[in-house]
Amino acid sequence: MANAKEIRGQIKSVKNTRKITRAMEMVAASKMRRAQERMRAARPYAEKIREVLGHLAQAHPEYEHPLMQVRPVKKAGFLVVTTDRGLCGGLNVNVLRNVVQKMRELHEEGVESNLAVVGNKGLGFLRRHGAHLVAELNGLGDSPHLGDMIGPIRAMADAYAKGEVDVVYLVSSRFVNTMLQRATVEQLLPVEKPTASAEQRAELWDYIYEPEARPVLDRLMQRYVESVVYQAVIEHLACEQSARMVAMKSASDNAKRMVDDLQLAYNKARQAAITQEIAEISAGAAAV
């Protein structure tokens, strides 16, 4: 058994670590609330664009954007969303596991993959595994803007429009609740042709375009793809802060239990030392 002095040092070290994890837990909780607010604020924008596209697609059934064209898959693209920092549990591990699994399935079918990656954690992992990266982005911070993400989005959209890839998957985490974040693989391109609901069809109206319809529809389609990726990034940020808060709370709780165990060991060591001293004194007195 370690002596009392060593145990006292361990207790001090664990208590200092617990102070750090408690502080990180509180910071993550604050950032999580702000990230959730941004996530909720962005949803209506993407939903409204989808709704407008549904109206326009119904009014102009002949319209087909290059990002909607379906063709046989010979090469795939991935837009992968991860975090810049760690200490967020298995959030990045789950996303990257989905990427590797999907790439392996495609490879078995003879389909190669190009990747655009957001976040240092994904970049480091995929570089080590020899993945073909065509775009990368890191350092978005806690308040990302759409303009910061245009590079990876355009890289994948342009590659699809030029026929360099035949399908693009968006891999990120979806926020279910504070305790649960689910890694998902969703098809980003080709965009499924928007359809109007029965209610929308009943209230269908025509639009007057200036100067003409196609540029408006083309721009809306680009904005829709951008909004889907932006929503995924800010939702992943909310997942990151939630996962970090839970991980730091778990670390703090474990540290508290460790301090309790060490305190018990310290008391036993101290009691054993006192008992030994008394025994030595008694033995010395008896010898005299």
Curated annotation (Swiss-Prot):
Membrane-related topology note: Peripheral membrane protein
Family matches, as Pfam families: ATP-synt (PF00231)
InterPro entries: ATP_synth_F1_ATPase_gsu (IPR035968), ATP_synth_F1_gsu (IPR000131), ATP_synth_F1_gsu_CS (IPR023632)
GO molecular function, one term: proton-transporting ATP synthase activity, rotational mechanism
GO CC entries: plasma membrane; proton-transporting ATP synthase complex
Gene3D superfamilies attached to this UniProt entry: 3.40.1380.10, ATP synthase, gamma subunit, helix hairpin domain
Gene Ontology biological process terms from the UniProt entry: proton motive force-driven plasma membrane ATP synthesis
Superkingdom of origin: Bacteria
Localization per Swiss-Prot or TrEMBL: Cell inner membrane
Keywords (A to Z) from UniProt: ATP synthesis, Cell inner membrane, Cell membrane, CF(1), Hydrogen ion transport, Ion transport, Membrane, Transport
Transcription in keyword set: no
Functional summary from the UniProt entry: Produces ATP from ADP in the presence of a proton gradient across the membrane. The gamma chain is believed to be important in regulating ATPase activity and the flow of protons through the CF(0) complex.
Assigned protein family: Belongs to the ATPase gamma chain family.
Assembly and oligomerization: F-type ATPases have 2 components, CF(1) - the catalytic core - and CF(0) - the membrane proton channel. CF(1) has five subunits: alpha(3), beta(3), gamma(1), delta(1), epsilon(1). CF(0) has three main subunits: a, b and c.
UniProt protein name: ATP synthase gamma chain
Species per Swiss-Prot/TrEMBL record: Acidithiobacillus ferrooxidans (strain ATCC 23270 / DSM 14882 / CIP 104768 / NCIMB 8455) (Ferrobacillus ferrooxidans (strain ATCC 23270))
